């Protein structure tokens, strides 16, 4: 397939980057040595598995929240937003990477390359901001329960989510001015090129990874302190009253945060090292480490739905109902009608001082 204009001068068949003056982490090997033979099959396997689990798992998350009244609350709207952030990469960037692997180079033109890299960034930054918002939500819910319903009213949460995605788009706009969205032949992907601007790379790592990690860590550390105090009854006069479901909710989101940090830390550490000293550090980054860091980052998009199913009974139960409905629609329609009638007889619990007013918050 023919490529247009300047993009055709950037990459040759086989993925070789030949743009002059483009060195380091974002470029191809100066000696044009072949890629390690494991890269294409490993990346293909990871992307195929990740895409399949990503689509099925995150659609299950979204449908579970929409179908189940116990899951339909302010906190879980952020989970739907996070699921959408994970879902977009499965529908556009990942299939395009598989096409690049098949052709041994980018064959879809510059427009698709820029769009694919933008959607990838949308997913990553959107995930970071949503995970941060979830941590703040859990922090307010447990540590400032008196003010929780004032902060997260029914119409406030959608506004918070819209603000998250607006900030995500704004955060990505500088990439078009810096020229950092390009094809990287080592990973067959159009992505963020770390050596396009070392100052911008450092800013991205600090603002979109280290700072959110610090905020989330603070929120969860404060929650852990209160949880331990409540369990040890260190403060008998405290009005904190945690139900097991509250603890499971917090634990689930804490695990999601830890997994995200583990999956994205290697790539961000590489980016920070390259930004500090691009001339010396970029050529010294082992290609196997660089590719593996991307494989780990790509794999993260399919893990959240699995965590919800493993750690949360309400999600696990709803997953089973949805899958059973797909397998045997008639049987599940009858069960759903009975279940909806039973739920309709239950009025929502009034707000209770403390943290027990959302027993099944996740």
From Swiss-Prot:
Localization per Swiss-Prot or TrEMBL: Cell membrane
Gene3D superfamilies (alphabetical): Rhodopsin 7-helix transmembrane proteins
Name of the protein described by the UniProt record: Melatonin receptor type 1B
Highest rank taxon of the organism: Eukaryota
Membrane-side (Cytoplasmic) residue stretches: 64-76, 137-155, 222-253, 309-362
Gene coding for it: MTNR1B
Subunit structure: Interacts with GPR61, GPR62 and GPR135.
Family from the record: Belongs to the G-protein coupled receptor 1 family.
Residues reported to bind melatonin: 175, 194
PROSITE patterns found in the cross-reference section: G_PROTEIN_RECEP_F1_1 (PS00237), G_PROTEIN_RECEP_F1_2 (PS50262)
GO biological process, alphabetically ordered: camera-type eye development; chemical synaptic transmission; G protein-coupled receptor signaling pathway; G protein-coupled receptor signaling pathway, coupled to cyclic nucleotide second messenger; glucose homeostasis; negative regulation of cGMP-mediated signaling; negative regulation of cytosolic calcium ion concentration; negative regulation of insulin secretion
Keywords per UniProt: Cell membrane, Disulfide bond, G-protein coupled receptor, Glycoprotein, Membrane, Receptor, Transducer, Transmembrane, Transmembrane helix
């Amino acid at each position: 397939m023919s490529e247009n204009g300047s993009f055709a001068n950037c990459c040759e068949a086989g993925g070789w980057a030949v743009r002059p003056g483009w060195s380091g982490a974002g470029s191809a090997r100066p000696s044009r040595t072949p890629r390690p033979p494991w890269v294409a099959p490993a990346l293909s396997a990871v992307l195929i598995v990740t895409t399949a689990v990503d689509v099925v798992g995150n659609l299950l998350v979204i449908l579970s929240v929409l179908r189940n009244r116990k899951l339909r609350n302010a906190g879980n709207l952020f989970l739907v937003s996070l699921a959408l952030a994970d879902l977009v990469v499965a529908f556009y960037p990942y299939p395009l990477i598989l096409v690049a692997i098949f052709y041994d180079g980018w064959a879809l033109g510059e427009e698709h390359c820029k769009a694919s890299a933008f959607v990838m960034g949308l997913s990553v930054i959107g995930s970071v901001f949503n995970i941060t918002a979830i941590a703040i939500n859990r922090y307010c819910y447990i540590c400032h329960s008196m003010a929780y319903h004032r902060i997260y009213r029914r119409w406030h949460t959608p506004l918070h989510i819209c603000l998250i995605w607006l900030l995500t788009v704004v955060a990505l706009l500088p990439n078009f001015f810096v020229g950092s969205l390009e094809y990287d032949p080592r990973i067959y992907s159009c992505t963020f090129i770390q050596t396009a601007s070392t100052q911008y790379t450092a800013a991205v790592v600090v603002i979109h990874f280290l700072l959110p990690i610090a905020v989330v860590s603070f929120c969860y550390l404060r929650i852990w302190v209160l949880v331990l105090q409540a369990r040890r009854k260190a403060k008998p006069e405290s009005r904190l009253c945690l139900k097991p479901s509250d603890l499971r909710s917090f634990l689930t989101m804490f695990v999601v945060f830890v997994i995200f940090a583990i999956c994205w830390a290697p790539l961000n550490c590489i980016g920070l090292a390259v930004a500090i000293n691009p001339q010396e550090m970029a050529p010294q980054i082992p290609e196997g480490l660089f590719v593996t860091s991307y494989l780990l980052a790509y794999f993260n998009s399919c893990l959240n739905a699995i965590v919800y199913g493993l750690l949360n009974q309400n999600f696990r139960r709803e997953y089973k109902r949805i899958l059973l409905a797909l397998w045997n629609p008639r049987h599940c329609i009858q069960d759903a009608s009975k279940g909806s009638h039973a739920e309709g007889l239950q009025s929502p619990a009034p707000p209770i001082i403390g943290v027990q007013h959302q027993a099944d918050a996740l």
